[in-house]
Every structure is written in structure tokens, then in C-alpha cells.
Design a protein with these regions (language model features):
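N-terminal leader/propeptide and maturation segments of large enzyme subunits in energy/redox metabolism
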Residues: 269-291
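Short alpha-helical hairpin
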Residues: 66-81, 90, 108-116
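Extreme N-terminal leader/anchor segments
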Residues: 1-79
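Structured alpha-helical bundle/scaffold domains in large eukaryotic membrane-trafficking regulators
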Residues: 35, 39, 250-253, 282, ...
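Short hydrophobic/aromatic segments of transmembrane alpha-helices and their interfaces
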Residues: 1-2, 82, 267-268
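Pocket-edge structural micro-motifs
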Residues: 69, 83-85, 101
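Aromatic-lined, polymer-binding surfaces characteristic
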Residues: 87-268, 275-278
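Phosphate/oxyanion-binding loops and surfaces in catalytic or ligand/nucleic-acid-binding neighborhoods
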Residues: 26, 30, 251, 277-281
Length: 291
């Protein structure tokens, strides 16, 4: 009875669209994704990105990963992508591929890690194929592909996998969760649509941009704070919008000036809010919520 009351109490705060998508997700079979693996993937020409915000080098070895203060090492081409003995959030981080920006690692080892992920993680595998995880991985792969400092030319197998991930994400947007997850989904579709060429890519781009513009107005409140009122989520969303502006401003004509102006204004407000809440040592307040 207590579980039922808790469940109903949670549902009462959801929007109708969230409830509908939640029911759809639970009752309907997963949508099938069709990609012609024999056809070469086409890229939009001349796409550029300025260097993104990157963490300090981790100091990890090429096949060593450290998340949540827990470090694991693997042999080359023998990464355990399941890691059942590790916490779920640790496993998620393994699949995010944030470490592609780690200057401690060699380009060759990163290339092997990407190929190993593709060979090991079929569509639908738990942890690897969840919308939030896929969203972060799409953006991280594209950033890496466009980063001249790694001197890595994307292989067709990588591009086909990236295209498949974007097609899968389009069918699995987190309408039932919204908030920062929804924004991550939109950002990934926007990046994939800007990176690839063709009708699918154009649809991803338009869909992602539409959601981003809507969510910039909804999630960044009048005072510049994020609507979840969490300093951590606020920082994550600020970085998302900085990445989005990076892509917009480095690729003339990609996005309409009025949309860029709106995104800049909302991002500027969010940066001002972040500046105002920082502690004297420059760290964010360690609260789950500011409310």
C-alpha cells in the first residue's frame, strides 16, 4: 500500500504528455531502427568547433578508467563494458566517453576503445543504450572527430555507428522525463544533424534545434537559474548551451540569427546566475536544490 501511495504521489506531479509517453514506453515494443550498413555515411562539409571546455588530464593509463573515485584497468581490446560488479553510475560513465577529451590518452588507444565499444555493444544492451547515455556519447564522439589535436580520421564503421545511435535516439527521446535529460537528447540530435548530411540528418537537426529553443526559454528562468534549482544541474546545462553556441557561432548560416541571439541571451543569464552563487573559493554550493 505504501508503495502504491508513493507511486501515485509521484505521478500527480507529472504533465499529461509525460504520462502518455510513460505509458507508451511501458506498453509498446521498442521501435526498430533501419540503417543501410553498406552505404557510405555522408558528412556535412566544413563543420567546425572551437576547443571545448575540457577537464585537467586524468593521469590515467590508456585503458584505465576512474569514475566516482573508483579506478579500473583493462587490457587493450578487452574492456569489460558490462562491469556488473561496479555501480550503475560508474558503468554509465564508462559509456559516456567523456574521456575522449582526456589529453593523458593516446589517439591510438582512444580509437581502439571506440572500435571495441562498437564491436561489443549491440543495440539495446543495458547501460550502453539508454537515451541519456547515448546522448552524451554522440556529442563526445562528434567533438573528438572534429578535434584536430587528436589527428584521428573517423572510420566509416564509427560513422555508421554514430548514425545508428542518432537514429535510435530520435525514436527514444525522454519525453517522460523532460528537464535536463530532454535537453541532452535535443543537444545530441542537434549535433548529429549538424555533423551528418542527408534527409535524416536534416530532420535530427530541426528536431533538436526546436527542442533546444523551447527548453532554453523554459529551463532557464527569469533570474538565470535552471528550473531544477540544483547547482550541479545548472552547471551541466550551462555547459550544454555553451557547446550549442560553439557549434552555432563556428558555422555561419547553420542557425538563424534570431535563434542564436535568444540562445546567447539565455546562456548569458545562466552564466550570471552561476557567478552569483559560487562560493568564495570558486566552487558551487553543495546543495541538491536551492529551493
Amino acid at each position: 500500500m505504501n508503495s502504491l501511495k508513493l507511486y501515485l504521489s509521484t505521478l500527480r506531479y507529472l504533465r499529461l504528455r509525460q504520462l502518455l509517453y510513460l505509458v507508451k514506453q511501458r506498453l509498446l515494443p521498442a521501435p526498430r531502427i533501419k540503417i543501410d550498413r553498406a552505404q557510405a555515411v555522408q558528412l556535412r562539409q566544413g563543420v567546425l568547433l572551437s576547443p571545448s571546455l575540457v577537464p585537467d588530464p586524468s593521469g590515467c593509463e590508456d585503458y584505465e578508467f576512474s569514475f566516482l573515485n573508483v579506478k579500473r584497468s583493462f587490457a587493450a581490446k578487452r574492456i569489460n563494458w558490462v562491469c556488473a560488479d561496479m555501480p550503475k553510475l560508474w558503468r554509465y560513465n564508462l559509456h559516456y566517453f567523456d574521456y575522449l577529451n582526456d589529453r593523458s590518452r593516446s589517439s591510438d588507444s582512444l580509437a581502439e576503445i571506440v572500435s571495441d565499444w562498437i564491436d561489443t555493444n549491440a543495440v539495446g544492451v543495458e547501460d550502453a543504450w539508454e537515451p541519456y547515455t547515448v546522448s552524451l556519447r554522440i556529442v563526445n564522439w562528434i567533438k573528438w572527430f572534429l578535434d584536430d589535436s587528436f589527428d584521428t580520421i573517423p572510420r566509416q564503421e564509427w560513422l555508421r555507428s554514430l548514425c545508428l545511435q542518432a537514429a535510435w535516439l530520435e525514436k527514444n527521446i525522454e519525453h517522460h522525463l523532460l528537464a535536463n535529460h530532454y535537453l541532452k537528447n535535443a543537444k545530441a540530435l542537434f549535433f548529429a544533424g549538424a555533423y551528418f548530411a542527408g534527409s535524416d540528418a536534416e530532420r535530427w537537426f530541426r528536431k533538436g534545434l526546436k527542442i533546444l529553443c523551447e527548453e532554453a526559454c523554459e529551463q532557464i528562468l527569469a533570474d538565470g537559474g535552471h528550473n531544477e534549482r540544483s547547482p550541479m544541474y545548472h552547471c551541466i546545462v550551462v555547459e550544454d548551451f555553451l557547446d550549442i553556441l560553439n557549434l552555432c557561432l563556428n558555422n555561419s548560416g547553420l542557425v538563424e540569427p534570431r535563434e542564436i541571439a535568444m540562445l546567447r541571451e539565455r546562456t548569458s543569464a545562466a552564466l550570471d546566475f552561476l557567478h552569483d552563487i559560487l562560493a568564495p573559493d570558486g566552487q558551487i554550493p553543495l546543495f541538491l536544490s536551492l529551493i
